[in-house]
């Protein structure tokens, strides 16, 4: 009986599993982006259209061939084709490209002409200069009007001042006449006193 009990206990006891040590967490280092060996797709598309010089515009296939020959785009043609389709659609929306024939990416494309935009700019500048010229004479006229008004007021004040002086001038003339009449008898009496004093000095001299 003891043997059977020991055997059953040995069967029931589960074997202990040894835990493996946890691996240290490795921090993911972000991969450095490789520098792109080609310019942006919109620049390559415009260069392809200008290089092909087709009157009706260039097709997507022709543009793709030009890009793969002249630029280091890679060998994944499916991705290149998808990127090219997106850039063509975005170029039409942003008006950088004009779709001359067809719809979507299956048509023909041309670069928008910049001459029309350059021709419109001088017209706006001329209009602005015309407005400036119109504003300057108005300001000058207003300034001249103010100057004339100031001159007229100044002349009026001068005339009134002259009138006041003319009214006051006769009073000044009357004063000197009265002073001359008062001083004239005093001057005549002075020489008589001097004549009377001279003979007195001559009489004192012989006594010494």
From Swiss-Prot:
Residues 37-113 form the H15 domain. One of its GO terms (biological process) is nucleosome assembly. Residues 113-208 are annotated as: Disordered. Gene3D superfamilies: Winged helix-like DNA-binding domain superfamily/Winged helix DNA-binding domain (1.10.10.10). Its main location: nucleus. The keyword Zinc-finger does not apply. The keyword Nucleus applies. One of its GO terms (molecular function) is double-stranded DNA binding. Signal peptide: none annotated. It is found in: Nucleus; Chromosome. Residues 148-158, 165-191 have a biased composition (Basic residues). Keywords: Acetylation, Chromosome, DNA-binding, Nucleus. The modification N-acetylserine is found at residue 2. GO terms for cellular component: nucleosome; nucleus. Residues 192-208 have a biased composition (Low complexity). Histones H1 are necessary for the condensation of nucleosome chains into higher-order structures. Belongs to the histone H1/H5 family. This is Histone H1.3. The lineage of its organism: Eukaryota, Metazoa, Ecdysozoa, Nematoda, Chromadorea.
């Amino acid at each position: 009986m003891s043997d059977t009990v020991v055997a059953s206990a040995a069967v029931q006891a589960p074997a202990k599993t040894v835990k493996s040590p946890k691996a240290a967490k490795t921090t993911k280092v972000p991969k450095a982006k490789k520098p792109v060996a080609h310019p942006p797709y919109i620049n390559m598309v415009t260069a392809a259209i200008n290089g092909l010089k087709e009157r009706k515009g260039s097709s997507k296939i022709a543009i793709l061939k030009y890009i793969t020959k002249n630029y280091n785009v890679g060998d994944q043609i499916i991705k290149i084709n998808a990127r090219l389709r997106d850039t063509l659609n975005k170029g039409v929306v942003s008006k950088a490209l004009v779709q001359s024939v067809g719809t979507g990416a299956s048509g023909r494309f041309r670069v928008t002409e910049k001459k029309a935009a350059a021709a419109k700019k001088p017209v706006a500048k001329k209009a602005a200069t015309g407005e400036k010229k119109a504003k300057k004479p108005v300001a000058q006229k207003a300034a001249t009007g103010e100057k004339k008004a100031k001159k007229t007021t100044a002349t009026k004040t001068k005339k009134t001042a002259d009138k006041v002086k003319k009214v006051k001038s006769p009073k000044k003339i009357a004063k000197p006449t009265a002073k001359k009449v008062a001083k004239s008898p005093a001057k005549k009496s002075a020489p008589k006193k001097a004549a009377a004093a001279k003979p007195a000095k001559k009489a004192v001299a012989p006594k010494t």
